[in-house]
Swiss-Prot record:
Disulfide bonds: none annotated. SUPFAM superfamilies: Aldolase. The keyword RNA-binding does not apply. SMART domains: DeoC. Pfam families: DeoC. Pathway: Carbohydrate degradation; 2-deoxy-D-ribose 1-phosphate degradation; D-glyceraldehyde 3-phosphate and acetaldehyde from 2-deoxy-alpha-D-ribose 1-phosphate: step 2/2. Keywords: Cytoplasm, Lyase, Schiff base. Its EC number is 4.1.2.4. This is Deoxyribose-phosphate aldolase 2. Its main location: cytoplasm.
Amino acid sequence: MNSAKLIDHTLLKPESTRTQIDQIIDEAKAYHFKSVCVNPTHVKYAAERLADSEVLVCTVIGFPLGASTTATKAFETEDAIQNGADEIDMVINIGALKDGRFDDVQQDIEAVVKAAKGHTVKVIIETVLLDHDEIVKASELTKVAGADFVKTSTGFAGGGATAEDVKLMKDTVGADVEVKASGGVRNLEDFNKMVEAGATRIGASAGVQIMQGLEADSDY
C-alpha cells in the first residue's frame, strides 16, 4: 500500500494565505500525496501550480454547513471544475436528513454528481452531528445518488472521524463506494486506525507528520 496516495493534504482554514497554499502544494509534490484539498478561491491557483504534477486538486462545496441551496452547490461545482478541480467534497443538507426529507438529501447529492461531470465526488455527512441510524441513512443516500465516497467530517463541527463511524459507513456502502476519514487525523496512529476501519482516503492537514511517522517506523 502506498500510504501517501491515500492522503488529501488539506488546508481549509478561512484565513489561509497564498504562502500557506504554496507550502501544502510543495509538500504534496514532495510526498506524492493524492491531492491537495483547498477552498474554491484557491482552486485555479493550485491547478496551475500542480499542472506538471500527478497531485490532484480537491475542493469543497456547500462548505462547511451544507446549508446552501442545491442550485448553489451545483453552480459551485461547475465553477470549481472549470477552474481546474479534479475532485469535489460536498456537504449534505444535514437538517433535511434529520427532518427525514431523504429525497431532498438525495437530490442535493445527485445535482452535484451531475455537475461534476464524471469527476470524483465525496459526500461529507458530518458524523459528529448524527446518530447511528442517521449515519447509516446518509451513507445509503450517498450510494444511491451515485457519489464515489462518503466522508465523515468537515472538521468545523467540533469533532472528526472515529474508527467506529468509518467502519459503520463502510459496512453500509459496501464495495461500491469508498470512505474518506477526515477531522482529527493527526498522526500515524490515527491514520492506521482509519485505514484498518475501512477508509481508503484520509483528509488531513497533518499529512507530513503522518509520512514522517511512517518513515520513522521503517527505520526499525
